[in-house]
């Protein structure tokens, strides 16, 4: 969340910057609540001082043998008024807190200004879109030909937007995840992490999914116990490792990587990508998270994005890198790069990774800090996250880019050790 001091001292500037994201900040409401808060706080502070003085005078009057009943009555009345004032102040603060939690992050000055995905800027391309001398099949046709990609059975089990993988395609899916994890551990210096797939609400509030995006989550209600949510991304569990912590400067940067299933209701995606594995309720992802000192976060974003790009390069999959514009960035991000991989059957690039610097936005919500050696004081860390990569979409890209005329699939060179030396599927 944003610094409350910033909202008090530079409210209109914040509103102007948020407008570039297409977000309208309710300036009048915040100003009204802040004014109410100041009035009530001043009144309660004055009342507390007066009550303290009256309480002190009770002892003095008692020593003089005076009737202290009127003073006692005044102190009791003031105590009741203070209790009422605290309730009023808590109510105002709760509304302010709820407003602040609904406000997205401020975009970095280097982020291109735009209303939607049309305003995104291509930064670079790698590889040439794959060309074929035969009619291209999509991943659904390729997978269903041998019965290894089964949406009908998945629908029988779980409904729409699920997939059942079997045989060599299931193995290829596993190979991709293992390859990604090993690459990030061995070449990029990440620590492999196994996290819970169920988290409590404070973890999701910490990374920004709650309260604003609850409809996108799968919730498990438990009588007499805290609700649990299936993680929409391992970003939630990995980033919250440092929730409430004060880290030593020598611990930074922290670099975590995890392979997990992810669960999303896709509430806003009705009618979009209904065929195949592009948009699922359950999908696997290898997620990278970095916790860094504030001065290092922009350089860390470039490094993180490069780590994700390396996966695509080694798989020899054509892709492009986009700098997202202000209107297309995620809620918690200060700057984001998206990687889009070439999907031959769609004749276009599709998102396969999103790499974001969230600045101190998540850290403030989580109270994740480090001790700055220059000041000796705890300060907020910066957090970053990125897909390295979405395993299902990478599988789609491999199936389609490595297809052959007979419907068989060549196994990418870097995956052969994970496939027992198998060179062709089908």
Swiss-Prot record:
An MF annotation (GO) of this entry: ATP binding
Keywords from the named record: Aminoacyl-tRNA synthetase, ATP-binding, Cytoplasm, Ligase, Nucleotide-binding, Protein biosynthesis
Top class in the EC scheme: ligase
Pathway involvement of the protein, from the record: Aminoacyl-tRNA biosynthesis; selenocysteinyl-tRNA(Sec) biosynthesis; L-seryl-tRNA(Sec) from L-serine and tRNA(Sec): step 1/1
Superkingdom classification of source: Bacteria
Catalytic activity entry: tRNA(Ser) + L-serine + ATP = L-seryl-tRNA(Ser) + AMP + diphosphate + H(+); tRNA(Sec) + L-serine + ATP = L-seryl-tRNA(Sec) + AMP + diphosphate + H(+)
EC number: 6.1.1.11
Pfam family, one: Seryl_tRNA_N
GO BP terms in the entry: selenocysteine biosynthetic process; seryl-tRNA aminoacylation
Residues reported in the UniProt entry to bind ATP: 264-266, 351-354
Subunit structure: Homodimer. The tRNA molecule binds across the dimer.
Protein family (similarity comment): Belongs to the class-II aminoacyl-tRNA synthetase family. Type-1 seryl-tRNA synthetase subfamily.
Name the record gives this protein: Serine--tRNA ligase
